[in-house]
Amino acid sequence: MTNDTARAVRVRYHTGTDAVMIRIPPARRGEPEMRCAERMHFVDAKGILTGSGGFPGMNVYRGCTHGCIYCDSRSAGYRFTHAFEDVEVKRNAPELLEQALKAKRRRSMIGTGSMSDPYMHCEEELRLTRRCLEVILQNGFGATVQTKSDRILRDLDLLDEINRSAKCVVQMTLTTYDDALCRIVEPNVCPTGRRIEVLHILRERQIPTVVWLTPVLPFLNDTEENVTAILNACVEAGVRGVVSFGMGLTLREGDREYYYAALDRHFPGLKARYIARYGNAYMLPSPKARELQALFQTVCAANGLLSSPEACFGWIRELPEKYTQLGLFDP
């Protein structure tokens, strides 16, 4: 038995009256061991698509095991009734999506990943995200997927087919160019270097991409070197645009406590600097926000990258007119 095989573990996920054993794979070579949830519960959801304005979205999972120290989805405002790492699985998501898409009068882009990453560890065996992509393809809709994980490459065949039949956009988050820092702030997902490799692979397949350069964590990754390195990587990978919300961080009840606990563990004394500067503010702009935003705008403009959230989201959500009309004999 190899060391990798020896490190593989099985964890028990509770489904109410049932218990399902799912194999969590070992860490990839050179990566830290994944610290995954020990519990996961399955639900029969009543609906799957949310949103308005012609851009519906879905979250197959609710909660996440990536462990990002800054995650806004931990906020009390989202009213989780279970621990964030006790991931809720909407086991009937593909069937609900099939019903919802067949009821629509016009095709559109379908988004996933805004609340919880669709490619966390359990997706390797549950394959619910893949099944939903199959439904999107079969019904002729477009798709946009937001993730931090290289597990998306498993579904490259579907992404390619969706992009050729309608439109597919992959949105990838790049927070810090420093892989060592990445393993602290985003501990249970592949490092930035690997995500950049994914962007290049997608470019080779002519699948368009957008990068989220957010959040910018005051006193951690808010440097010109970091922003420049990420933007240069975006240019080299041929991304269409970069999303930035002003070079800072937002904290609310729920995620603030988690973030500060992580600072205490990994960066002793830094929490005190945050409290002294920001108090309990919701928006925490970097002290260098103005300079970093100017740098961001300059590099994006020089390289033809979409740089405002409005421009990026507008382009992502746009499905060419020839794909939106549903014919009498469409499936």
Describe every region a protein language model picked out.
Residues 160-163, 199-205, 297, 301:
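Surface-exposed amphipathic alpha-helices with a cationic face
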Residues 177-179, 186-188, 201-223, 246-249:
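Conserved strand-turn element in the central/C-terminal portion of the radical SAM core barrel
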Residues 89, 151-153, 218-221, 250:
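Acidic-and-aromatic substrate-binding clefts and catalytic sites of carbohydrate-active enzymes
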Residues 1-44, 225-331:
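Auxiliary Fe-S-binding modules of radical SAM enzymes
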Residues 140-141, 207, 239:
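A structural motif
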Residues 22-171, 175-183, 192-196:
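Conserved Radical SAM active-site core
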Residues 85-89, 124, 186-194, 222-226, ...:
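Alpha-helix N-cap and loop-to-helix initiation/capping positions
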Residues 126-129, 160-172, 221-238, 263-266:
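Short, electropositive alpha-helical surface patch
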